[in-house]
Every structure is written in C-alpha cells, then in structure tokens.
C-alpha cells in the first residue's frame, strides 16, 4: 500500500519518544564551529587500534594517560569504538574536567603564595619611601634659600650670556678682525684681495653705523666713535694703496714691463674714492712714462733697436718721406701700445673698436682718465717731433716732396685724432705741423704759378702745349696721385676744401699762362683768333686730360670744358666763314642778310641771276673737291675728335646756307625766272656730298662716340703707363723702406 509523502503523519506519531529522538537526530545540525570542535575532541579521545599491538591480547578498553595538556584516550578494538564512546563519554568528560580543575587549583595556590611575598616587599618599600620623603622634606626646608639664590644666579647668568652674545655680534659687525687690521696697516702684508675685502668691510661698517647715529644719545656716541675709528682705518688702507701704486708706477720704465695686473687695476679703482691720492699717483705714472717714451724716441732716432736693428731713423734723413714717415709710424705704434696699456690698467671696457677707428658716443670715466694720462705720456714727444719735421719741411724745395710730407702728416693726423681724440696735445702738435706743411706747400705752389707767368713767350708754330705747361701738368698729376692715396672718404673728396684750393692754385696759373701766350701769338703772327683758339684748345685739352684720370676733379673739369667749348664755338664760326669764302657763297649770304626788306634779291648786284649763277657754279666745283671728314686748317688741333666736330659743324652751316639760297631762288617774290635751272645741285645732293644730310646728327654722334672711345683708349694707355711708372717708383721706395726696417 502506497503512502503519499505529502500526507501528514497521524498525530499519534508526534508523541512517540522514538519518533521524537529520530526527528531530533535528523534535525540536529553539526555545521557550526563549536559543534565540530566538540566532535573532533570526542573523536580524539577514542583513537583507533594501534597497529603494533596487533595480535596481542587487549583488554576491553584501556585508559592511557598522556601529558598534562592532552585528554586521555581510550584504545578500542575494531568495531567497539562507537559503543565504548557512548558508554564512557560522560564519565571521561567529567574526569577530564576534574583533572583540569585540580591543575588550575595547584597553579593558583602557587600564584597566591608568590603574591603574598610580593605584598610583604611592597609594604617594606613603602616604609622606606616614607623615610626618604621625610628626609627630602627636611632637606628642602633646609636648602630653600640656596635654591632661591641659585635661581637668581641662573637668571643673571642667562642675562650675562645674552649680553655677551649681543656684544660679540656688535663687535663682529662694527669692528675689524685682527687679520683685517693687519692687512690695512701692516707694511709686511702685500696689497691683495684681503686688503680690498677689509676696505669693503670698513665701508659696510660705516654704512651700518648710520643707524646708530640716528638713535639715542648713547648709541649716537657709539656711532661717532665707530665712525672716527673706521675713518682712520680707511685712510690707513688708502695710504697703503697709494704707496703701492706709486712704487709700481715707477717700475713702468720700459715697454717690455707694460702690463697691469688685476691687483693694480683694482687698486686704481679703489683710489677713485680719494681723488687727491689718485691724482698724485697718476702724476708719478705720467712723469715716469713721459720720460721713458721720450728716451725711447730719442734712442729710436739715434741708436736704433737692440743690436742695431731696426736701424736708427735718422739714418734715412736724406729721404724726407721715409724720415718723416718712420718718425710718425714710431709715434703711432707707441701711441697704440700705450693706449692699450692704459685702457687695460684703468679697466676700460673695449667695444670692439680697432686702433685708429673713430670713437663713438660719450666717454666713460675710465676712458676719460686713460685719455688724459695718454695725453700727458705723449706730451714729451711733441717738441722733438715738431722740430725735426719742421726742419725737414723747410729744407724741401720740390713741391711734390712737400705735398707728400703734408699728405703724410694728414694721414697720421686723421689716424691719431680717431685714436686719442682731437684735444690731445700730440694731436694739436700734429695739427700745427700739418698746417705749416700745407702753408709751405701752397707757398711753393704759388711760387710755381708765379714762375709760369714770369717768363712768357709766344707758342711755336705747331701750337702744341708748351713744355712749361707739360711740366706743370706732370707735377699736378703726381700731386693728384698723392692725394688719391689719402684717408679722405672718396664721397667727400669732391667737396674737400684743400683739394679745391690745390686745383685752383695749380690749374689757375696754367690757364692764365696759356691765355697770355695765346695773346702773344695772336699779336706776333697776325693769326688772329684762329691760332689763339687752337693753342687754347690744345693746352686746355692737355690739362683736361691730366685731370680726367681722377674722379674727384669734376668741378675743375667742368670749368675747363666750358672754356674749351667757348674756343671751339669761336673756331667753328671762323672756320665756317673761311669755308663760305672758299666755296663762293660768302657774298651771296652777306647780301641775303643785309638786303633791304622791300627789294628782291634778283635786283641786287651780288645776287643777280648772273652773279648767283657764277657763285653756284663755283660752289658746285668746290663741293666736288672738299673733304667732308677733315680740313687742313684743323690739322694743328691735337684732338682729332674736336677737329672733326668743328669741320662737320662748319659744313652743316654751309649746307644750311645752301638750303636757304635754294629757298630764295625758288621763291617767286625774289624775281628769278628760271630758278630751277640755276640750281645745278639739289639740297639733298649737297648734304650727301658734304656728309651732313638729314641724318648727320646721328652719324655725327656715332662718329663722335667712336672718336671719343679711341681717344679714351689712347689716353688710358698713356695714363696706365704714367700710373705704372709712378706706382713702380712708389713700390721701389716702399721696398727700400721695408728692407731697411727689416
């Protein structure tokens, strides 16, 4: 019979004890930790059978005692453990509890005994502590006054230590150490960084002391005392620096010793706070260097270098430019060396400026001092240099040598002015010598001009430039070559007053001489204006050719060109008149120009049909024989270009005159019945025959350019030859100078 599991059990089964136990056993859970630990302990109490005891007779069960910390275990036979455990579990557990309690009681009894002993010791220690406290109370009452006194003394000691610390700080801030005092005052300690550090410390003390001076009366008095003491220390330090500088400055007697150490530079920088001491030290330096430089200059003039090299400068006194140039070069080199030495000593911060380069901006204090000292150092050179150069200038008679010396002086004057300034004594001396040299040069140039005008004679038959003009032009060429080597900026040469004065004094007398000679030629030969113009054009052209070599003579060239144009126009007019006479049209043109306004040309004698026919016939014959390129009358002109130009312009005027005659003849108002038959040649035909047709200006420009190019090539060839000669001469002279210097 099947039963439904979901059918509830009958109520009687719930009261059955067996059912209850079964349900209880089934519903009990042993998953909690305490239950599992209890089961593990119980299972440990009843271990399995020992394998070693196998085969031996064992009692039903045996109680085995292990150490105190383990529970007793029962050895059970196979299959009996569960039964024995159920039988003896409660008994075994109670036995274990009893055994454990006994052990606890024994342990606590021993602890109680030890605690009793400890209590006795504590009571004894309490008695001893009470005795000590009693004695301490007695001692405190007996030493109370001493403790109070000790507290007072301790407070006084702390106050004294604080004051001592403050005094130490005050002294360290407002006084110098022994080493610093020694550096300031002792002569045995040399000048160096310790002295400068001590001076800085003194200055700092004086700066800090200003706070004391503005405080209470006592502090102000302390400040005054400190200021007085530090003032003495400062003066002692500056005096020591002053003595050091004076001693060192006296050692600068030779060029090889010119080297300023960093200590020297800093010493001079410190002395700037004492201008009087610095001025006195610098006076020692300037007197020493001035004497040394002067002796070196005199030795260079008379003795030369060590072992005779370089050779003495005065050995070249026979060569003025070499002599003056060597002296000025020595002065310039010495100036550069001295300038570099002084700038290094005074600590001038150089702004990448080369020696001889112009200074820019305002001078600083260091640069101003260096310039002043340099001026005084070189002051001794002024007199011997001036005397020797003046004697050299006075002894010169040649104008070129005088100008070379003057130009050389100008070169070094510009260089020295840029190096040491225009206010320096040496520069002023050079300026004075330079002015005197130019005065002597201009006097010589004036004397040459007067010499040109003193002995005049008429030009020769060739009308070429006279020999005196050629000599003067050669001198002018060399003068301009010397000027071209000067330091004057090429952009400023055109406006240079010295150049304008030179050209005026050199060219003016030459032009005046040529004009006077031309007048003498006109009066002597009776050649009139023609020969005068040819001579003037040749002479002025020669001068113009001399000046064309240089691009800074534009104004003078323009003046000469205007004069040449005037004479060319005069020659063109006269040449045209001569050609007009030779071709037979002169009378006809005079009649056309001077006839009455109301009278036809055919009724006048010179322009009557018969006379005009004869004149035109002569013109036709002349035109077939005339040379359109040149004329024998212009053969004396040295410029082929001008000869062609004058001849072509004259022929052009002949062509224009013939054209005007043609217009008059063909004009019915003039009264010519057969005018066309009278004109044997047309106007264009005449223009072609004379080479001056409608396109003659273009052809003339082309020919003129060709002639100019040819003349320019010839002139360039000649100029290059002349320049080559002058350059070779200068190179030879420079080579000789270099060899002598070497």
UniProtKB/Swiss-Prot annotation:
Subcellular location as annotated: Golgi apparatus membrane
Biased composition annotated in UniProt, kind: Acidic residues: 694-703
Taxonomy of the source species: Eukaryota, Fungi, Dikarya, Basidiomycota, Agaricomycotina
Membrane topology: Peripheral membrane protein
Pfam family membership, one: COG6_C
Record organism: Cryptococcus neoformans var. neoformans serotype D (strain B-3501A)
Protein name per Swiss-Prot or TrEMBL: Conserved oligomeric Golgi complex subunit 6
Keywords: Golgi apparatus, Membrane, Protein transport, Transport
Similarity remark: Belongs to the COG6 family.
Entry annotated with the keyword Transport: yes
Record bears the keyword Protein transport: yes
A cellular component term, taken from the record's GO annotations: Golgi membrane
Compositional bias per record (Basic and acidic residues), positions renumbered to this chain: 720-742
Subcellular location, principal: Golgi
Functional summary from the UniProt entry: Acts as a component of the peripheral membrane COG complex that is involved in intra-Golgi protein trafficking. COG is located at the cis-Golgi, and regulates tethering of retrograde intra-Golgi vesicles and possibly a number of other membrane trafficking events.
Disordered: annotated span: 692-742
A biological-process GO annotation: protein transport
């Amino acid at each position: 019979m099947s039963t439904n599991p979901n059918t509830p059990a009958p109520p009687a089964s719930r009261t059955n004890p067996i059912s209850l136990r079964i349900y209880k056993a089934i519903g009990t859970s042993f998953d909690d930790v305490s239950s599992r630990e209890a089961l593990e302990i119980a299972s440990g109490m009843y271990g399995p059978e020992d394998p070693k005891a196998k085969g031996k007779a064992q009692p039903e069960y045996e109680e085995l005692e292990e150490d105190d910390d383990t529970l007793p275990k029962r050895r059970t036979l196979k299959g009996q453990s569960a039964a024995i455990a159920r039988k003896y579990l409660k008994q075994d557990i109670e036995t274990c509890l009893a055994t454990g309690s006994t052990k606890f009681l024994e342990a606590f009894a021993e602890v109680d005994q030890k605690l009793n002993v400890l209590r006795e010791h504590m009571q004894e220690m309490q008695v001893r502590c009470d005795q000590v406290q009693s004695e301490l109370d007695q001692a405190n009452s007996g030493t109370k006054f001493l403790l109070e006194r000790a507290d007072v003394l301790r407070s006084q000691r702390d106050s004294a230590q604080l004051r001592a610390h403050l005094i130490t700080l005050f002294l360290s801030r407002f006084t110098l150490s022994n080493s610093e005092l020694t550096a300031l005052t002792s002569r045995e300690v040399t000048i160096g960084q310790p002295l400068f550090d001590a001076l800085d410390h003194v200055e700092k003390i004086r700066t800090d002391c200003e706070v004391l001076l503005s405080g209470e009366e006592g502090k102000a008095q302390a400040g005054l005392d400190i200021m007085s003491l530090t003032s003495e220390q400062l003066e002692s330090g500056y005096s020591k620096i002053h003595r050091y500088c004076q001693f060192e400055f006296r050692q600068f007697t030779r060029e090889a010793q010119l080297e300023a150490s960093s200590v020297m530079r800093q010493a001079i920088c410190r002395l700037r706070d004492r201008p009087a001491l610095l001025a006195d030290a610098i006076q020692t330096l300037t007197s020493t260097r001035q004497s040394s430089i002067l002796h070196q200059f005199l030795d260079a003039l008379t003795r030369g270098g060590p072992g005779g090299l370089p050779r003495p400068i005065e050995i070249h006194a026979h060569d003025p430019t070499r002599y003056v140039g060597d002296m000025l070069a020595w002065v310039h080199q010495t100036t550069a060396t001295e300038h570099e030495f002084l700038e290094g000593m005074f600590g001038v911060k150089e702004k990448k400026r080369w020696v001889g380069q112009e200074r820019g901006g305002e001078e600083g204090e260091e640069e101003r001092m260096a310039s002043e000292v340099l001026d005084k150092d070189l002051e001794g050179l002024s007199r011997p240099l001036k005397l020797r150069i003046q004697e050299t200038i006075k002894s010169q008679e040649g104008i070129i040598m005088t100008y070379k010396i003057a130009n050389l002086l100008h070169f070094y004057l510009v260089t020295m002015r840029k190096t040491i300034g225009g206010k320096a004594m040496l520069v002023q001396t050079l300026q004075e010598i330079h002015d005197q040299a130019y005065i002597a040069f201009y006097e010589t140039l004036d004397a040459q001009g007067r010499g040109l005008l003193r002995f005049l004679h008429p030009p020769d038959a060739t009308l070429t430039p006279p020999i005196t003009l050629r000599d003067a032009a050669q001198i002018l060429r060399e003068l301009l070559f010397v000027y071209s080597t000067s330091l004057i900026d090429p952009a400023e040469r055109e406006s240079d007053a010295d150049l304008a004065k030179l050209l005026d004094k050199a060219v003016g007398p030459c032009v005046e001489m040529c004009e006077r000679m031309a007048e003498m030629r006109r009066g002597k030969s009776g050649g009139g204006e023609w020969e005068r113009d040819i001579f003037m054009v040749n002479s002025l052209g020669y001068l113009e050719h001399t000046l064309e070599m240089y691009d800074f003579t534009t104004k003078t060239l323009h003046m000469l060109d205007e004069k040449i144009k005037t004479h060319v126009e005069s020659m063109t007019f006269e040449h045209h008149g001569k050609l007009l006479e030779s071709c037979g049209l002169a009378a006809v043109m005079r009649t056309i120009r001077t006839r009455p306004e109301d009278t036809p040309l055919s009724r006048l004698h010179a322009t009557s049909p018969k006379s005009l026919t004869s004149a035109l016939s002569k013109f036709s014959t002349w035109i077939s024989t005339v040379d359109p390129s040149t004329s024998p009358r212009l053969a004396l002109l040295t410029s082929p270009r001008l000869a062609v130009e004058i001849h072509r312009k004259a022929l052009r005027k002949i062509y224009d005159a013939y054209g005007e005659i043609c217009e008059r003849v063909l004009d019915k108002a003039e009264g010519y019945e057969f005018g066309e038959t009278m004109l044997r040649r047309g106007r264009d035909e005449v223009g072609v025959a004379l080479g001056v047709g409608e396109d003659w200006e273009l052809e003339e420009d082309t020919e003129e350019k060709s002639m100019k190019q040819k003349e320019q090539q010839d002139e360039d060839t000649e100029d290059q030859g002349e320049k080559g000669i002058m350059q070779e001469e200068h190179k030879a002279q420079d080579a000789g100078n270099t060899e002598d210097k070497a």
